[in-house]
Amino acid sequence: MARYRGPVGKVSRRLGIGITDKGQRILAKRPFPPGQHGPSARRRQVSDYGLQLLEKQKARYVYGVLERQFRRIFEKAQRFPGETGAYLFILLERRLDNVVYRLGFATTRAQARQLVSHGHITVNGRKTNIPSYTVRVGETIAVRPESRRRTYFKNLIDSGALARHKTPDWLRLNPADLSGEVVAMPRREDAEPGINEQLIVEFYSR
């Protein structure tokens, strides 16, 4: 299955959660499922399985992860002691593409994934082009010196967008040199809200 590249508004309305900032804005304006019935449409009663599937799909679309990758991340989370659902989201937050997004180097996770894949990002000074790379405490994530000359990255600094960007507590941003450091492990509450991780655990425990 390919990564979703269709209208983010439509899928956000179908899932009932904004999968990007744009999706959130569209959902706020039209908080009902897509289709001909419009605002009068009600979300259908769904089975327990349907609810579990919906929560899994929410997480997959928000973080931009394919089904096979998502299942591998879940299986890795199962090996940790404690709550599997919480560790699932901690692992999703530690993905390099997500960290690039959280640091404000990209406006969406899809764009962050592209920046990583195209070789614009380094981890501890070494070019890393694997979006699924799991960051560790103490690592420095930065834009490659060769890439900083590009108009896009110059505008990030000149516009003041990075200086205004609010990063989560587990990351420390240095806007001047387009770098950031992982200073702590993310917590479940640092991850995307509005997703019930317990239903995801139940989905894979069937």
Swiss-Prot record:
GO (cellular component) term, any one: small ribosomal subunit
InterPro entries: Ribosomal_uS4, Ribosomal_uS4_bac-type, Ribosomal_uS4_CS, Ribosomal_uS4_N, S4_RNA-bd, S4_RNA-bd_sf
Keyword Transcription regulation: no
One Gene Ontology biological process: ribosomal small subunit biogenesis
Keyword Cell division: no
GO terms assigned for molecular function: rRNA binding; structural constituent of ribosome
Subunit field text: Part of the 30S ribosomal subunit. Contacts protein S5. The interaction surface between S4 and S5 is involved in control of translational fidelity.
Function: One of the primary rRNA binding proteins, it binds directly to 16S rRNA where it nucleates assembly of the body of the 30S subunit.
Family affiliation: Belongs to the universal ribosomal protein uS4 family.
Protein's name in the database: Small ribosomal subunit protein uS4
Taxonomic source organism: Roseiflexus sp. (strain RS-1)
